[in-house]
Amino acid sequence: MPILEKAPQKMPVKASSWEELDLPKLPVPPLQQTLATYLQCMQHLVPEEQFRKSQAIVKRFGAPGGLGETLQEKLLERQEKTANWVSEYWLNDMYLNNRLALPVNSSPAVIFARQHFQDTNDQLRFAACLISGVLSYKTLLDSHSLPTDWAKGQLSGQPLCMKQYYRLFSSYRLPGHTQDTLVAQKSSIMPEPEHVIVACCNQFFVLDVVINFRRLSEGDLFTQLRKIVKMASNEDERLPPIGLLTSDGRSEWAKARTVLLKDSTNRDSLDMIERCICLVCLDGPGTGELSDTHRALQLLHGGGCSLNGANRWYDKSLQFVVGRDGTCGVVCEHSPFDGIVLVQCTEHLLKHMMTSNKKLVRADSVSELPAPRRLRLKCSPETQGHLASSAEKLQRIVKNLDFIVYKFDNYGKTFIKKQKYSPDGFIQVALQLAYYRLYQRLVPTYESASIRRFQEGRVDNIRSATPEALAFVQAMTDHKAAMPASEKLQLLQTAMQAHKQYTVMAITGMAIDNHLLALRELARDLCKEPPEMFMDETYLMSNRFVLSTSQVPTTMEMFCCYGPVVPNGNGACYNPQPEAITFCISSFHSCKETSSVEFAEAVGASLVDMRDLCSSRQPADSKPPAPKEKARGPSQAKQS
């Protein structure tokens, strides 16, 4: 994912109203180019006989006057009529059609630096400061005063579509029986008093942040949060943990929501949740373990229903978690916006809080504020049954996730840049080497690439398991051949160049995944039967991303994490820093073939070997400082 920077000083900073940016439309790649690239991406990942069969299928699909050309013409017509020809297809395919539960399977989390709260008041001061930052940031959005993002990295200096920012606080993912709906509040007039929903002890409270046309100060917010904590502690008033329902599979939650909506009180309460700015989850202590790994798990799934897993409402785009034990961060419903937008927003909030925290926030007592309101949710016997089922399934998610935060500190992006390499490409090749070492094969790999250079652009896929990467990893693991280091280095450079070329293809709208997706979806309307092209095992395999990766760089102390996207897969989110690289590695215990600790150790070993390979041709003064023979893996106290 390309790194973002604010507009360079030499360029005028424009308001970020996405309607005002004169961005080009996403281009439609040439059909034959996409088909050739598809075959090139898959040839080395499937058996030879299977590839020959797929090659013939692709040839028939792309033949002159054939189905491929017909679909391509339809797609070009769609490009003319829409702002972005793939956005609807992509949103449905990536998110809204997915029936899996949101925690771990879909919703990523950003984990802040651990906080050291002395008491509950410290926790609430932090939460009040965070809410104040949210309101300040929302003011920038409402006034279209947010500076435009500009691309950095490959093809830097281009303005990026800002539309996603306007969904941060105005979106809600409504569960459906077969497909979810992404709802956006579009009203330009001021709605009812703006409010945040505060979750505390699995109860939900309405915190009005504007009262009598005045935005509440941090002191006011602190006062109101103290009232909420007191109200939540009243066990006589406690309601069932309805938030658990949002952690269930999407179809199951849609069914449970239909039951809830039969009651008018529930309808009003759900409406307040669905229209809120964001959630703030005041969590109780977790397991007592406060490593990066355990804090990340608290954000990803809350530790299940016995800890903080019910203190959530997963449909809301942003849930800010402020834990009594100092575990803080944000859980993101991913469908409205991409990770880099979340990081930009979060870094803005943390900078606001660093400035604000220089003064001690005390409760304001100038005027008596109306008490926050507890949301009433009536629970029928049928809903009780849904809750029991949801709790059991969330517990299965918690037990099944195999997750580790691994900080590789032998070197970071400073050393990689000294080699004249892209840190992202270097790390991607290291991930391929790690996977090959463990499994003696490469697999379809997903790396998100921003296409925000275009109107309403989201992402496409960099397929980093290239033939060139395979040649390199085979050379690095074939100890019998004894290939000279100089030849291995040349293979590394070739693999890096292949990754760079595919990255440029992706960010300029020329990659294959979105294109093939659109052709497949157009075929649904045009063909009575699914075309053999999209039923072929090679195509189906190409969309099972056993390795799901993303670079999410930050300038502040925080990191992003998510779960695998297939049952036998690994998630690998990484954050390159000058002298270290933080990896969040995920897999499922239910797959006996995978192990997150083993994969993290293999990544560390691969990065060390690649450093040593680079150092073999360097003059002494440019070698990395204090070479280390081995990367200590998670089992050697490297787990964060």
Curated annotation (Swiss-Prot):
* Catalytic residues as annotated in Swiss-Prot or TrEMBL: H334
InterPro entries registered for this protein in UniProt: Carn_acyl_trans, CAT-like_dom_sf, Cho/carn_acyl_trans, Cho/carn_acyl_trans_2
What are the BP-aspect GO terms?
acetylcholine biosynthetic process; adult walking behavior; antral ovarian follicle growth; chemical synaptic transmission; dendrite development; establishment of synaptic specificity at neuromuscular junction; memory; muscle organ development
Q: Under the cellular component aspect of Gene Ontology, which terms does the record hold?
A: axon; cytoplasm; neuron projection; neuronal cell body; synapse
Superkingdom of this protein's organism: Eukaryota
Task: Give the keywords, sorted.
Answer: Acyltransferase, Neurotransmitter biosynthesis, Phosphoprotein, Transferase
GO terms assigned for molecular function? choline binding; choline O-acetyltransferase activity
PANTHER family associated with the record: CARNITINE O-ACYLTRANSFERASE, CHOLINE O-ACETYLTRANSFERASE
Record note on quaternary structure: Monomer.
| Role, per record | Catalyzes the reversible synthesis of acetylcholine (ACh) from acetyl CoA and choline at cholinergic synapses.
Protein name in UniProt: Choline O-acetyltransferase
Q: What is the gene called?
A: Chat
